[in-house]
Curated annotation (Swiss-Prot):
Belongs to the NusB family. This is Transcription antitermination protein NusB. Keywords: RNA-binding, Transcription, Transcription antitermination, Transcription regulation. HAMAP family: NusB. PANTHER family: ANTITERMINATION NUSB DOMAIN-CONTAINING PROTEIN, N UTILIZATION SUBSTANCE PROTEIN B-RELATED. One of its GO terms (cellular component) is cytosol. Involved in transcription antitermination. Required for transcription of ribosomal RNA (rRNA) genes. Binds specifically to the boxA antiterminator sequence of the ribosomal RNA (rrn) operons. It comes from Bacillus cereus (strain ATCC 14579 / DSM 31 / CCUG 7414 / JCM 2152 / NBRC 15305 / NCIMB 9373 / NCTC 2599 / NRRL B-3711). Signal peptide: none annotated. The gene is nusB. SUPFAM superfamilies: NusB-like.
Amino acid sequence: MKRRTARERAMQALYQMDITGELEPKVAVENTLDEGEETNEFLESLVVGFVENKEAIDEAIRQNLKKWKLERISIVDRSILRVAVYEMKYMEEIPHNVTINEAIEIAKTFGDEESRRFINGVLSNIKDTL
């Protein structure tokens, strides 16, 4: 599985967890996989890592939102931001610009017309604080 695919699956897993409020991370990951597709370490680390660091990640996002509340952001955008912020804060081997570019590309696919610019702005602000 390519890293872009893993990031997309991680966003989908966080989306499911946000909607249901009760899925276990590994179950959410399994629900995103195509039949016969196997998970990988990167995908699982994104989802489990977010769950383990949810408070710090959400706080980093909150501190960089202008005129928005985290709870008012679309679930898709919130999920993309959460995956990207986890990656930026806890996966130091991945350059921040790579993470931001990947999040923007995922937003183009899954978000609305404004998602790309919104996510770019929030993540750029967060990058400056790390």
